[in-house]
Curated annotation (Swiss-Prot):
Mg(2+) binds at residue 103. Allosterically activated by ADP and other diphosphonucleosides, and allosterically inhibited by phosphoenolpyruvate. InterPro entries: ATP_PFK (IPR022953), ATP_PFK_prok-type (IPR012003), PFKA_ATP_prok (IPR012828), Phosphofructokinase_dom (IPR000023), PKF_sf (IPR035966). Disulfide bonds: none annotated. Belongs to the phosphofructokinase type A (PFKA) family. ATP-dependent PFK group I subfamily. Prokaryotic clade 'B1' sub-subfamily. Substrate binds at residues 125-127, 162, 169-171, 222, 243, 249-252. This is ATP-dependent 6-phosphofructokinase 1. It is an enzyme of class 2 (transferase). It comes from the Bacteria. Keywords: Allosteric enzyme, ATP-binding, Cytoplasm, Glycolysis, Kinase, Magnesium, Metal-binding, Nucleotide-binding, Transferase. Pathway: Carbohydrate degradation; glycolysis; D-glyceraldehyde 3-phosphate and glycerone phosphate from D-glucose: step 3/4. PANTHER family: ATP-DEPENDENT 6-PHOSPHOFRUCTOKINASE, PHOSPHOFRUCTOKINASE.
Length: 319
């Protein structure tokens, strides 16, 4: 193998640049050429490839976003489009592709590998919704962003003696809400994986007031949604001023944390090692602080689990 390519796909995540840096420099270290693909699969089918060197990834390790830019590409589901992508890679002499993204990006890599392109996927998503790995690149940074927002909302909630609802990203995965709720000391955490009782929530808020609490923080995962409506209902029933804040895309931005940089660097280096071993259709993950590779098929088939014991602990200590 003489030449590889790398792209970022789907929603951006802090740490993607650190992963790009690791992939590029590890490949160059082993004498491989590296091509960067701009705008994910959409850029690939448009032939947006350029040669990368050490300077291309200089001083990006702590930058948020992705220097390659990213995009969603629904047409990549079409076989003729994927065949075009494979032909473009072949025309550039690219023998393997490293894909940094989420489950949709991995599916694209899996289908591309069936056309003879060696592929390896790195989990880059703030949602932490890939069950085969303990953590995804970007999750820790997003978590810290959310906790910072919760702490600031707590300041103003305390001043106004109100209830603050914070809606966070995560799609149908409640990990970001759960971890942020624990770290932010939220009185209630609402996630898609666990049943939610509005009456019990209102009871918790009122009991808090009886016990001397002057404010409450509620963290809601976007997979549940309805924060604005919930705020109106709480205020209507309790008479306590309640405000909802949807954090939105601020959760995807910012410089990656040290943990995300280290994780991205380890995973990026591992991706190149896996390709040099002749493997294909693999994804990189971390379990118990060990970096490993796994078949894409196997990884995508693992049913996502939710840490109910951690959720119960949060309920016990945060009320």
């Amino acid at each position: 193998m003489k030449k590889i390519a790398v792209l970022t796909s789907g929603g951006d995540a802090p740490g993607m640049n650190a992963a790009l840096r690791a992939v590029t420099r590890m490949a160059l270290h082993h004498g491989l050429e590296v091509m960067g693909v701009q705008r994910g699969y959409a850029g690939l089918i448009n032939g947006e490839l350029f040669k990368m060197d050490r300077k291309s990834v200089s001083e990006i390790i702590n930058r948020g976003g992705t220097i390659l830019r990213t995009a969603r590409c629904l047409e990549f589901k079409q076989e003729e489009v994927r065949e075009k992508a494979a032909q473009i890679l072949k025309a550039y002499g690219v023998e393997a592709l490293v894909v940094i993204g989420g489950d949709g990006s991995f599916m694209g890599a899996k289908l591309l590998s069936k056309l003879g392109v060696k592929t390896v996927g790195l989990p880059g998503t703030i949602d932490n919704d890939l069950s085969y790995t303990d953590y995804t690149i970007g999750f820790d940074t997003a978590l810290n962003t959310v906790v910072d927002a919760i702490n600031k909302l707590r300041d103003t909630s305390t001043s106004h003696e109100r209830v603050s609802i914070v809606e966070v990203m995560g799609r149908n995965c409640g990990d970001l809400a759960l971890y942020a709720g624990i770290a932010g000391g939220a009185e209630a955490i609402i996630v898609p994986e666990m049943p939610f009782d509005k009456d019990e929530l209102i009871k918790t808020i009122l009991e808090g007031r009886t016990n001397g609490k002057t404010h409450s923080i509620i963290v809601v995962a976007e997979g549940v949604g309805g924060s604005a409506e919930l705020a109106k209902e709480i205020e209507s029933v309790t008479g306590i001023e309640t405000r909802a804040t949807i954090l939105g895309h601020i959760q995807r931005g910012g410089s990656p944390t040290a943990d995300d940089i280290v994780l991205a660097s380890r995973m990026g280096a591992k991706a190149v090692e896996v390709l040099l071993e002749g493997k294909t259709s693999k994804v990189i993950g971390i379990k118990e602080n060990r970096i490993f590779d796994m078949d894409i098929d196997e990884a995508l088939d693992i049913e996502r689990s939710f840490d109910e014991s951690l959720y119960e602990m949060a309920n016990a200590i945060n009320k």
